[in-house]
């Protein structure tokens, strides 16, 4: 049985500085959001507009359930409306810990507002149980997008070179760096330290833009000032899913503090250098090396992730975020969950 799906994209997807990412959503889906929900004033106003816009759409559509994916602050609009309208809320990927990010607080808040949980690992299931969630409300699926990566036909270096007008045949590192809640001091010097360390390796550098967290403008201005239109550097606002994983696949290594440097990189068997505390608390695959903001430490670990012996060891790497869960079973599982008379009657389970 098919489930008709509607997608609401939050305001950030319609912003020029983030590359109008709404354009990368598959056209076969029913997108019910639009750029009229954006305010240029501030994020709080955008958040408020999103709530009103989504509530209006939900009133018209009358959905049987709402799905929230991830832990960005914008995701809170779904749970708020779910509670107010008494619509079942399904949350993907709760139970994780990222101590250095504001997403940490949002993730656990969404978990407590959700009626059913699809989690990445057994450890994350245990954590939700610690939060008082009933066991029957949780299923371990792994990160489902990793199944798509295994089936994906990656873009070649030639195809990427033609698209971006950049020579991908020269070895490059892929940098994604987001603001970290507890590391906002001396932000420019932290980025400068990373850039200097990569430059010492004489590698080309491909940089994707940061997310919309507080102080993202500082990062954007800095990388544009120091890297834009300079030989051997490529800045990308938003490249879409297929191009991004192709960029990862073809890179020498990933560097920065993005979750993709932990989750997706392991499936692609690409070395990754995770810097700082943004991802602290997450399960770390063996292709990932973590270090602090210290020049000697960063340089030493760049040598490690760029080492051929280290790369060879990754051939048999098992990603802890992968699972044998069959995506084709999802509609059947969801329909069964919706029949449970206690779905909306949450209890706090003491243990």
Task: Locate the predicted segments by residue.
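C-terminal amphipathic helix plus adjacent low-complexity
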Residues: 307-351
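A nucleotide-sugar donor-handling region in carbohydrate enzymes
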Residues: 14-17, 113-189
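Short acidic-hydrophobic, aromatic-tinged amphipathic segments that line or gate anion-handling sites
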Residues: 33-37, 119, 139-141, 235-237, ...
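A donor-sugar binding/catalytic signature common to diverse glycosyltransferases
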Residues: 68-69, 76-80, 91-92, 117, ...
